[in-house]
Regions:
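A conserved regulatory-domain signal marking ACT and ACT-like small-molecule sensing domains
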Residues: 281-367
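Interdomain hinge/lid region at the active-site interface
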Residues: 208-275
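Small-residue-rich helix-loop
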Residues: 267-285, 289
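Rossmann-like NAD(P)-binding element
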Residues: 57-86, 91-92, 98
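Internal alpha-helical scaffold of NAD(P)-dependent oxidoreductase catalytic cores
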Residues: 139-226
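NAD(P)+-binding Rossmann beta1-loop-alpha1 motif at the extreme N-terminus of oxidoreductases
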Residues: 1-61
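Rossmann-like NAD(P)(H) cofactor-binding subdomain of soluble oxidoreductases
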Residues: 81-132
Length: 367
C-alpha cells in the first residue's frame, strides 16, 4: 500500500533521504517542506519530491510518516507544533538531529496521549557539500542510521521505519538517547571543539609568527578540516548537549595537564607511553571499518611530476566511488604521498590500490 511521506527540510540530508526512499518505494508520494524557494524548486525539478510547500502545517495532516531533517531548535519547535495539528491516526514522526535527549524529551512531553508514534533518529552521514543541489542517493550507504526508541516507540514502528528507509542502504542500530549523546559527545562533538580551538590558537599565534600559516599542512590540515563546519549547527549541538560536552572538556584538560607535567619533568618514558598508547588504541579501533559521519577511505600515491599523470590515474579509476582528490604540494614527512584519493567504501579503495599497483610503478599507501 502506497504511503505519503513528509520530509521537512530539503537540505543535503532531507533531499538525499527522499532519493533513497524513492529508490525502494517509487510508488510512495513524497511531500517536502523548505523555507527556501530555490531548494523546493531543485527538489521538484530533480524528482526528489512530488509536492512542496513553505507552510509546514499544510502537509502534516496528509502524511503517514513525518521526518524532520532540520536544525535542532527548529525540530523541537515543529514537534510542539505537530502536537496541536489534526494528524493521521498512528502517524510516525521522526527526526534527524545530531543530539537526541533534548528532542526525545520534548516529543515525550508534547506527543504523549496523542494517536501518534515517535522515534528519534540520527543518520550519521554527511559531506562537505550542502543543500538539495548536492543530494546523493548513496550518501547513507554503509553509514550508521541510529534510532533512539522512547516510550512513544513500538516495535512495529522501528520495523516500518527500517522498511521505509531500506533504499538508503544504511546500517540501522538502536541505542538509548542519553547514551547516544554521551558517545557522540566524545567522537563527534568534542573533536569539533578541538579543531576550532586549534585553528583559532594558530590564527592568533600566526600574528607574531607569520610562517606558521605557510608551514601548516599534512597533520594540521587533517586535524582542522572540521573547523570549516557550519557555526550555527554546531552552536545548537553543543547547547543541546552541554552537560556531557562540559564533562569531555574537563576530562581533556586533565590529560593535557598530565602530558604537560611529563614534559616539564623531562619524563621520557611517560611521554613515549602517551604517544604509543594513542597509536595502539587508534589502530585497534579499525576506524575505516565503521560507518559514520564523513566516513571515507584514503589512498595516497607518490606520483612523478609528469604531464597527464593524474589524468592517467583517474582513467584507471573510472567507475569507482571516488569522493575527493587532493594534491599535497608540501614536501613533509607526515604526508604519505603527493596524490590523496578518497573513496566512499572499502571495496573501491581495494580495487583502486590493485589497479594502480598493477598498471603503474607508483608507490601506493593506504591510510
Amino acid at each position: 500500500m502506497a504511503k505519503t511521506i513528509y520530509i521537512a527540510g530539503l537540505g543535503l540530508i532531507g533531499a538525499s533521504m527522499a532519493l533513497g526512499i524513492k529508490r525502494d518505494h517509487p510508488d510512495y508520494e513524497i511531500l517536502g517542506y523548505n523555507r527556501s524557494q530555490a531548494s523546493r524548486d531543485i527538489a521538484l525539478e530533480r524528482g526528489m519530491i512530488d509536492r512542496a510547500t513553505d507552510d509546514f502545517a499544510s502537509f502534516a495532516p496528509l502524511a503517514d510518516v513525518i521526518i524532520l531533517t532540520l536544525p535542532i531548535k527548529q525540530t523541537i519547535a515543529f514537534i510542539k507544533e505537530l502536537a496541536d495539528l489534526d494528524l493521521k491516526e498512528g502517524v510516525i514522526i521522526s527526526d534527524a538531529g545530531s543530539t537526541k535527549s533534548a528532542i526525545v524529551d520534548v516529543a515525550e512531553q508534547y506527543l504523549a496521549g496523542k494517536s501518534v508514534r515517535f522515534v528519534g533518529a540520527h543518520p550519521m552521514a554527511g559531506s562537505h557539500k550542502t543543500g538539495a543541489a548536492s543530494a546523493d542517493v548513496n550518501l547513507f550507504e554503509n553509514a550508521y542510521y541510529i534510532f533512539t526508541p522512547s516510550s512513544l516507540t513500538s516495535p512495529d514502528t522501528l520495523e516500518e521505519m527500517k522498511d521505509l528507509l531500506s533504499g538508503l542502504h544504511a546500517r540501522f542500530i538502536e541505542i538509548d538517547a542519553k547514551e547516544h549523546d554521551r558517545v557522540t559527545s566524545q567522537i563527534s562533538h568534542f573533536p569539533h571543539i578541538l579543531a576550532s580551538g586549534l585553528m583559532e590558537q594558530t590564527a592568533v599565534y600566526a600574528q607574531e609568527h607569520e610562517m606558521a600559516r605557510r608551514f601548516a599542512a599534512g597533520g594540521f590540515r587533517d586535524m582542522t578540516r572540521i573547523a570549516e563546519s557550519e557555526p550555527g549547527m554546531w552552536t545548537s549541538i553543543l547547547l543541546s548537549n552541554r552537560e556531557t560536552i562540559l564533562d569531555r572538556i574537563a576530562d581533556f584538560k586533565e590529560r593535557l595537564d598530565e602530558v604537560g607535567q611529563a614534559i616539564s619533568k623531562g619524563d621520557e618514558e611517560q611521554i613515549w607511553n602517551f604517544f604509543n598508547q594513542a597509536r595502539a588504541q587508534r589502530q585497534a579501533m579499525e576506524i575505516h571499518k565503521r560507518g559514520g559521519v564523513d566516513s571515507s577511505y584514503d589512498l595516497y600515491v607518490d606520483v612523478p611530476d609528469e604531464e597527464d599523470v593524474i589524468l592517467r590515474i583517474l582513467e584507471l579509476l573510472r567507475g569507482t566511488s571516488l569522493v575527493n582528490i587532493h594534491i599535497n604540494e608540501e614536501n613533509r614527512e607526515d604526508v604519505h604521498g603527493i596524490l590523496q584519493i578518497s573513496f566512499k567504501n572499502a571495496q573501491d579503495l581495494e580495487r583502486a590500490e590493485r589497479l594502480i599497483t598493477e598498471n603503474t610503478d607508483y608507490t601506493v599507501v593506504i591510510k
